[in-house]
Regions:
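Glycine- and other small-residue-rich loops at beta-strand/loop junctions that grip anionic moieties
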Residues: 11, 20, 58
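Short, small-residue-biased leader/transition segments that mark boundaries at the very start
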Residues: 1-3
Length: 147
């Protein structure tokens, strides 16, 4: 395991396996309008429906917004954007990111690395855990796959 604290920030659209590698960290923050997934909504729409113009629909189904991923425990924080968006006021956006990083790194630096590693491990063990099996799993378990 990595023996230092790791903090990542998704600034815009992270839509690839390479982007997902940035998520292997102690804390993952996203700008409030950022997207984070293994594939872009446009790419998913192209594959699923052979129609890239359905990217908004794909985005909604994929649940890859900062708010969605905070709910799922993938993201740990959402960094607010200025009223005009991240690119509308770069100074304010930079300040918001800096405040998050300073606060997070200060908190992490107070912890023993063994505790950080255990927390990181626990965080990733919780991602993707569901309390109820899906309808498809229930049908398959009952032997009714064709219903």
């Amino acid at each position: 395991m990595c023996s230092s604290d790791l903090v990542s920030v998704v600034l815009g659209e992270g839509g690839s396996g390479g982007a997902l590698a940035l998520g292997v960290c102690d804390d993952l923050a996203m700008l409030e309008n950022a997207l984070y997934s293994v594939i872009s909504p446009r790419g998913a729409a192209s594959i699923l429906w052979k129609d890239a113009s359905r990217e908004q629909e794909a985005c909604e189904i994929m649940r890859i917004t900062a708010q969605d991923l905070l709910e799922f425990g993938v993201a740990d924080a959402i960094i607010p954007e200025p009223e005009d968006g991240a690119q509308g006021d770069l100074d304010k956006m930079s300040q918001n990111i800096k405040e998050y990083l300073v606060k997070t790194i200060a908190a992490k630096s107070q912890k023993d690395i063994d505790i950080l590693q255990k927390e990181r491990y626990t965080k990733f063990r919780k991602i993707g855990v569901f309390s109820e099996p899906s309808h498809e799993v229930q049908k398959a378990a009952a032997g009714n796959e064709n219903e």
